[in-house]
Swiss-Prot record:
Belongs to the GcvP family. N-terminal subunit subfamily. InterPro entries: GcvPA (IPR023010), GDC-P_N (IPR049315), GDC_P (IPR020581), PyrdxlP-dep_Trfase (IPR015424), PyrdxlP-dep_Trfase_major (IPR015421), PyrdxlP-dep_Trfase_small (IPR015422). SUPFAM superfamilies: PLP-dependent transferases (SSF53383). This is Probable glycine dehydrogenase (decarboxylating) subunit 1. Its EC number is 1.4.4.2. The lineage of its organism: Bacteria, Pseudomonadati, Chlorobiota, Chlorobiia, Chlorobiales.
Length: 444
């Protein structure tokens, strides 16, 4: 496709219109020392076929899950996404849609968001879900802000092992909110110590936060943690993986006041880290404190169902300092993909995905621990992810496995810890699992 540049006459007309004589006058405010003094080192002009070939060659340097067996996890998982998800989400009515300021003219977009909210409420056992957040980390941080607002208290206690990146986002949000203290509970055998937590939660605690499954893949003692939070009048916030809820209890059923999650694992590809989807759900008591958009269903003057943005006095339509948030855009397309995927799966389908992921993860863990020098780092129960102690550095295993077109897992040394974090989804076959074990045996 040719690019038609501006002519000299057109450039002169534009400069004259904005009131400068020449291009040098236009950039006069840019200091000389920061201006580029030489021509850019660009390739010569190419046609579309040549550009396409060049980009494909550059892209081939990447390793991707389409041609590698992946055991990567730590928040981004290689679950199967039916072709129908992308086909439906790519329809022009959805793909190019943006909720306008007169939102009610976009009934299709609003209904899709309403259905997403309804599905998330059922999945998490909660009363209200918003239209989505940027990602799981921002959803958790916003949940903490809700707790500070609702309780009027100052501190946050993290009960178990939170994802390190999520911890960083939480710290950033709370620092901006007045440098609120965050207390980390001690970790014993991969999960938070309930006994130690008892000594950390007080009448000054706004919320107790737990991730389930946690960063190591282990299952926290969520019911005991929730009881401690309630005893001290703190809100109980759970960050739960949506796929895990196919087999684990919904957070609302064991007392969560706010439940959040990273929605990448339902309907959204790993995509080199984003865009992802932040799930945020609350009990009815906190509906006016929830950030972001809420879609509600009502009747029009003729008695037909209609969808609206509701309770907008919480949001950016009022004075900034009184709003619960100033988020206007959300991850609506990612949310659409999530609700399409979950709708295609249904209740039995999500249970099947969760069960197969869990069973295959435990099969692989059992096989790996039979190898000399390999062992599970923690004895706590896990869902689809676990940490292995290895006889050689995890980085070495990861590097060697790449030659076999295998992503072996996540090296925990990035966070100053030992071990290889391995995740297994329903996509992995028995042959792939057994082959992985054989390759590990040759490295041990």
């Amino acid at each position: 496709m040719p690019f038609i540049v501006n002519t000299d006459a057109e450039r002169a007309e534009m400069l004259r219109e904005i009131g400068v004589e020449n291009f040098e006058a236009l950039i006069a405010d840019i200091p000389e020392e920061v201006r580029l003094k030489k021509a850019l080192d660009l390739l010569p002009a190419m046609g579309e076929p040549e550009v396409k070939s060049l980009l494909e060659k550059m892209a081939s340097s990447n390793a991707a899950t389409c041609d590698h067996v992946s055991f990567l996890g730590a928040g981004a998982y290689d679950h199967f996404i039916p072709a129908a998800v992308k086909t439906i989400a790519s329809r022009s009515e959805f793909y190019t849609a943006y909720t306008p300021y007169q939102a009610e003219v976009s009934q299709g977009t609003l209904q899709a968001i309403y259905e997403y909210q309804s599905v998330m409420c059922r999945l998490y056992g909660m009363d209200v879900a918003n239209a989505s957040m940027y990602d799981g980390a921002s959803a958790l941080a916003e949940a903490a802000l809700i707790a500070l607002n609702v309780t009027g208290r100052n501190g946050i206690v993290v009960a178990g092992k939170l994802h390190p990146y999520t911890s960083q986002v939480l710290e950033t949000y709370l620092e901006a909110a007045g440098d609120r203290p965050i207390v980390q509970n001690s970790i014993e055998d991969g999960i938070g110590s309930v006994a130690a937590l008892e000594t950390l939660v007080s009448s000054e605690t706004a919320a107790v936060i737990v991730q389930q499954p946690n960063f190591y893949g282990c299952l926290e003692e969520v019911e005991a943690i929730g009881e401690i939070a309630k005893k001290h009048g703190a809100l109980f916030i759970v960050s739960a993986d949506p796929v895990s809820l196919g087999v684990l209890e919904a957070p609302g059923n064991y007392g969560a006041d706010i439940a959040v999650g990273e929605g990448q694992s339902v309907g959204n590809a790993q995509s080199f880290g984003g865009p992802y989807l932040g799930i945020l759900t609350v009990k009815q008591a906190h509906v006016r404190k929830i950030p972001g958009r809420l879609v509600g269903m009502t009747k029009d003057k003729d008695g037909n169902d209609g969808f609206i943005l509701t309770l907008q006095t919480r949001e950016q339509h009022i004075r900034r300092e009184k709003a619960t948030s100033n988020i206007c855009s959300n991850q609506a397309l990612c949310a659409l993909q999530a609700v399409v995927h979950l709708s295609l799966l249904g209740k039995e389908g999500i249970q099947d995905v969760a069960n197969r992921s869990m069973q295959k993860a435990h099969y692989l863990a059992d096989r790996i621990t039979e190898l000399p020098g390999f062992s599970l780092k923690f004895s706590a129960p896990f869902f689809r992810e676990f940490v292995v102690e290895t006889p050689v550095p995890a980085a070495t295993i990861i590097e060697k496995m790449l030659d076999k077109k295998v992503f072996a897992g996540v090296d925990l040394s990035a966070w100053g810890e030992d071990g290889l974090l391995i995740a297994v989804t329903e996509k992995r076959t028995k042959e792939e699992l057994d082959s992985f074990v054989s390759e590990l045996a040759s490295l041990g």
